[in-house]
Amino acid sequence: MIHMLNAAAYRVKWTRSGAAKRAACLVAAAYALKTLYPIIGKRLKQPGHRKAKAEAYSPAENREILHCTEIICKKPAPGLNAAFFKQLLELRKILFPKLVTTETGWLCLHSVALISRTFLSIYVAGLDGKIVKSIVEKKPRTFIIKLIKWLMIAIPATFVNSAIRYLECKLALAFRTRLVDHAYETYFANQTYYKVINMDGRLANPDQSLTEDIMMFSQSVAHLYSNLTKPILDVILTSYTLIRTATSRGASPIGPTLLAGLVVYATAKVLKACSPKFGSLVAEEAHRKGYLRYVHSRIIANVEEIAFYRGHKVEMKQLQKCYKALAYQMNLILSKRLWYIMIEQFLMKYVWSSCGLIMVAIPIITATGFADGDLEDGPKQAMVSDRTEAFTTARNLLASGADAIERIMSSYKEITELAGYTARVYNMFWVFDEVKRGIYKRTVTQEPENHSKRGGNLELPLSDTLAIKGTVIDVDHGIICENVPIITPAGEVVASRLNFKVEEGMHLLITGPNGCGKSSLFRILSGLWPVYEGVLYKPPPQHMFYIPQRPYMSLGSLRDQVIYPDSADDMREKGYTDQDLERILHSVHLYHIVQREGGWDAVMDWKDVLSGGEKQRMGMARMFYHKPKYALLDECTSAVSIDVEGKIFQAAIGAGISLLSITHRPSLWKYHTHLLQFDGEGGWRFEQLDTAIRLTLSEEKQKLESQLAGIPKMQQRLNELCKILGEDSVLKTIQTAEKTS
């Protein structure tokens, strides 16, 4: 290699060092061409060609995709586009609901700190030049004075630097608090927390959006404001200072300014061409994080069932699969950042540094204020020190300005990442708002057109959503359904056009096979599911109380379990005391847990402390506490003994509570006056309940079931006896005669 360089240098009459430098430049240029050409070429390809190529190689079965998937694909990918600015402006209304807010105060303080740091940087740059001038002039007294000033200015400078970080964190926390408050208000309004999971399918993991996405968005906005505001101020003020200094010395600032603009423009174009789609990458990473968290929470919620089935291997594989998908996405982002940051550093550190030296040198060399050709040695020495001061000051200012421009251009990556978080947070609020207004969209699997469905199902094209045409009217007395169908969130009609009326004092027994719509009716009456057609007259929610088969045990004391969802203050406002609660527990045969668990103020994990029957009796105790006009009982005493169950129902009737009960126990029929029976095929009937006749029919049904259950065993034994005796059965002879006739 050395001999080749020597020969080449001799042939073209270059020095050996010059040839080595040119060879290094050629190698660097070749590497840059190899790195940048595929990226730029990919950008210049026609989108139509890519689309045709993708369609040509896509399998036929994959071309039939869901309409909802097509809608998602048509949405612009998160990035620096009009959709991003629109979403950011909408979120700004939440962050700054009015002019004078806590967030505005923190923002103003943060801005003052950023401006102060810029002026301090300019002052320190000038002070550095004066210190260097005193060294060149060999003035120790001046040097010591300037050095003391430099140390003194370090005190406010370090405070401002620390204040900038502190105020940035406070601003991010204020943004997060504002977003969380608004999100919680929307999430818990009009039972959105239930509907967004069970009625709508656009948010797979709302907990991820409510926690991680809001936090990352708030931090990104605050950090980006700091990373953009100060650099812009630095560029403006340092440019003004440099131009003013050059003009005062008789130098023209036009050349360096044009060079700086050209370099910045070229760098911006190259970085934009090479920049990956960080917005889409970050949004996908957040989605995979949320799904991994969802799988973990799903295992925790079903840990007992998984342990019984010994399904830990399957669940572990599922977790590993989700984690590997997340790790792959994170590695993809890291690899793209590696090459992008390498190109960014090469352009902004080395290319800009060389251009910066040229920009500093040109004004000093061409300035008439520094000419020293005809001066004596004394004035010439002064001119040298002035040049040194000017060069040092200009270099520091230029370095500060270059660093500011570098941060501005580096912020492009942060802006695209912010676009990903903005899209997820905005989409969360958008879905919450639509669900709150009764607009639901589900992502379901489309079935083939020739797929046969049972008669009761409602077939809808996936491109449409079910129109909510029903009306709900709050009344003081009675529950009336007029042509109200029971339709599941998936669009399946399980019962059509219900018509019945339950007045105060009536007690309705609801029966039917599994999946016929019994619990679904309670969801409609409670407002969880919408009324798609007809008219529903019902009391306000405070006059209706729903008790499920597995009552929810809240976090808190024993008192909180009885009065849920009221608080202790609400209980006192209603005029209840602990003695009243004791009487309620006596009526449901649950008073013993007060002494057993340590009194009303005992705080435990009640879902593990109470047995299944005790939880159900606690649910009935809540009914007696709230005293509703109507109680919706969904097999809420299936784990309670029959004698205690009967006493509780009798006490509820004595308290004037109208019962709407789903139960399979015949012992509870006598506490009801009317019957609503579903047939499981979309039909139903509503009639007055005659308990005696129904019990007689039930006994006859059970007798026939027991008799028919023994027929297969009797037939098997008869065949065995026929084989042993070698004879035919009389029944077989009769059946043969019937076939021949």
Curated annotation (Swiss-Prot):
Residues 107-399 form the ABC transmembrane type-1 domain. The keyword Oxidoreductase does not apply. It is found in: Peroxisome membrane. The modification Phosphoserine is found at S58. Its EC number is 3.1.2.-, 7.6.2.-. Residues 479-705 form the ABC transporter domain. Strongly expressed in brain and adrenals, and weakly expressed in liver. SUPFAM superfamilies: ABC transporter transmembrane region, P-loop containing nucleoside triphosphate hydrolases. Homodimers. Homotetramers. The minimal functional unit is a homodimer but the major oligomeric form in peroxisomal membrane is a homotetramer. Forms heterotramers with ABCD1. Forms heterodimers with ABCD3. In addition to tetramers, some larger molecular assemblies are also found but represented only a minor fraction. Interacts with PEX19. This is ATP-binding cassette sub-family D member 2. It comes from Mus musculus. The lineage of its organism: Eukaryota, Metazoa, Chordata, Craniata, Vertebrata.
